[in-house]
Amino acid sequence: MTSPTSVAGPLRVANAPCSWGALEFDLEGEPIGFAQVLDEIRDTGYSGTELGDWGFMPTAPAALRFELQSRDLQLLGAFVPVAFAEEGNHAEGEARALKTARLMRDATGTAPLIILADDNGKLPERTRNAGRIRPEHGLSESQWTVYGAGVNRIADAVRRETGLRTVFHHHCAGFVETPDEIAKFLESTDPAKVGLCFDTGHY
């Protein structure tokens, strides 16, 4: 029998700034700086990190590269939320994803991921019913078409310009939360362009 490590190399574990409260949601308390976050990621034995929200870490490639390399950390990806159900949000989402992808490409010698997600927590009905979503809380067929087209568009643009791969992170309080919604998302998107960042905590 083939062991997992013989195929993909030894398993390594990473963390992300959101574990320190540095994320897109408004939280109480004084945020801590990126240097402390990276120091503690390193000191607790993790081998990599996500980028965090734009501007949390340095946005100059050389500066970001220095901060990561000086701690022997690998940059694995960046979370980019977009309200995909509205077609008018796709162009702005593409611009943000490309800006983030360019930074990661230029700062690393690896192939980090763009991690797309819905703009979670912004719709009161989805937020109030998170964890107990019913079919009537979801998207219509026409909205799924718009949603999938937006994800494909951004993933295609990122791959074309930077060579980076895109995955999608399903999450509570967004339109891709339940097993049925995840299945519909996969049906509505192109697997050659976008993969799934499977989150066991939100399935």
Task: Walk through the language-model features, giving the residues of each.
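Active-site-proximal loop/turn and secondary-structure-junction residues that shape catalytic pockets
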Residues: 19-21, 53-55, 81-84, 118-122, ...
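Active-site acidic/histidine proton-transfer and metal-coordination neighborhood
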Residues: 3, 74, 86-196
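N-terminal pre-domain/capping segments
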Residues: 1-110, 145-146, 152-153, 191-195
